[in-house]
Amino acid sequence: MNLLKIAGGTLSVAAGAAGLGWLGTQIEGHGFDFSAGASRDLGKAPLPSDLPEAVTHYAKVVAPEGLPVVETALIIGKAKLTFNGLTFPARFKFHHDAGNTYYHHIQLLWFGLPVLTVHERYRDGVAEMALPVGEIVNNPQVNAAALMGLWAEAIWFPTTLLTDPRAHWTETGDHSATLLVDGMAEEEMFTVRFDPESGLIRDLTSLRYKQPGDQHRTLWFNEVLKWEMFNGVRVPSIAQIRWGNDAPWAKWQVQHVLYNTD
């Protein structure tokens, strides 16, 4: 009987801890403090004349007054990130040297407070991930995946997607095109679908390595759910990522987008 009581008590404590843990994930918390200043206007970037029709239309919809020159971009917001079936609120800062490097600062929140921090960096073809369980540096699969992430995130500074000479667009239909960037394997090519009514990107899909050491790539979806204007450019304010037929594991809610900050 004493053993049963101990077992029951242990189970109650575990259940209580699990309930408390779940409750902590229901409090979103605040995004990062915003004190980065304002975007700097560096003029307009000319739109290439050889883009597919759907891509040209997209460019005119997202930047009706012309594409701004973008050297750096800062994207700040909140997120919902799911790991092993448990969804955490999070906040993030993405720093980009447009088309070249990125730095990700992501914090998972519990009861609104940061409990886990992730740092990710990509530069000179090398990805670095600093996680609570260790570091991953210069892994071939992670390097390849990071390059794809770099360009998928350029949807928040579309001047790079549309004008960088390393980005090669090919028309595949009235409302679709492919995007292959220098350095990517051909099978990593993005398929980009545009909404027939708005002309905006509906989703980008590709094959991407999911884990270090993977021998095969997994179908990767980047889906846009909502668009808003920041700095005269229409970019995704809500977007999500999923693998294959899985439920989305990341949902981003963008609060600020800045270009060419000091």
Regions found by a protein language model. Name each.
Residues 3-21:
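Hydrophobic alpha-helical topogenic segments used for membrane insertion/localization
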Residues 15-33:
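Membrane-interface motif at the C-terminal end of an N-terminal transmembrane signal
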Residues 28-74:
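N-terminal leader/targeting segments and the immediate start of mature chains
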Residues 56-135:
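N-terminal mature ectodomain segment of secretory-pathway/periplasmic proteins
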Residues 69-76, 98-105, 172-180, 201-203, ...:
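Short, hydrophobic/aromatic-rich segments at coil-to-beta transitions
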Residues 107-114, 130-137, 206-211, 240-247:
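Short, solvent-exposed aromatic-acidic interface loops
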Residues 128-183, 214-215:
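Flexible, processing/modification-adjacent segments and terminal tails
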Residues 177-262:
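Gly/Pro-enriched, hydrophobic low-complexity segments
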